[in-house]
């Protein structure tokens, strides 16, 4: 099913320790997350202004924050995998796109990894992992 409604988060700074760097390499000072969570329209277009009628993203953001602080990561891939697993707990999320990136790369660039998980893939992951 194609969803045209989503919750988007852009540029969330994560205080995490990822990778190892040599003496002459530029150390990233920021790791950031962009996230798009596809949800049903009835969680976006509401009649009554009540939190019970929407997807409360604050607990997920807190989960992501705690994951990012949980220790040293060798790769961005491991961190994005754990973030995806955190998304699985929230059944209002029907599909998800994640982009985790670091800056600076070579003084002024950004570099990251992205993953998009469809509704069918998310359902299979939930069945396997939860």
Residue ranges, per PLM feature:
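N-terminal, polar/charged subdomain of small-to-medium soluble alpha/beta proteins
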Residues: 1-130
């Amino acid at each position: 099913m194609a969803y045209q409604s989503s919750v988007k988060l852009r540029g969330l700074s994560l205080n995490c320790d990822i990778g190892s760097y040599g003496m002459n390499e530029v150390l990233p000072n920021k790791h950031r997350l962009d996230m798009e969570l596809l949800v049903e329209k009835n969680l976006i277009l509401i009649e009554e202004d009540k939190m019970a009628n929407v997807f409360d993203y604050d607990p997920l953001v807190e989960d992501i924050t705690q994951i990012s602080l949980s220790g040293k990561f060798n790769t961005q891939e491991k961190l994005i995998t754990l973030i995806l697993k955190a998304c699985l707990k929230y059944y209002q999320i029907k599909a998800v796109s994640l982009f985790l990136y670091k800056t600076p790369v070579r003084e002024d660039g950004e570099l990251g990894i992205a993953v998009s998980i469809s509704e069918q893939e998310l359902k299979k992951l939930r069945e396997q992992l939860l």
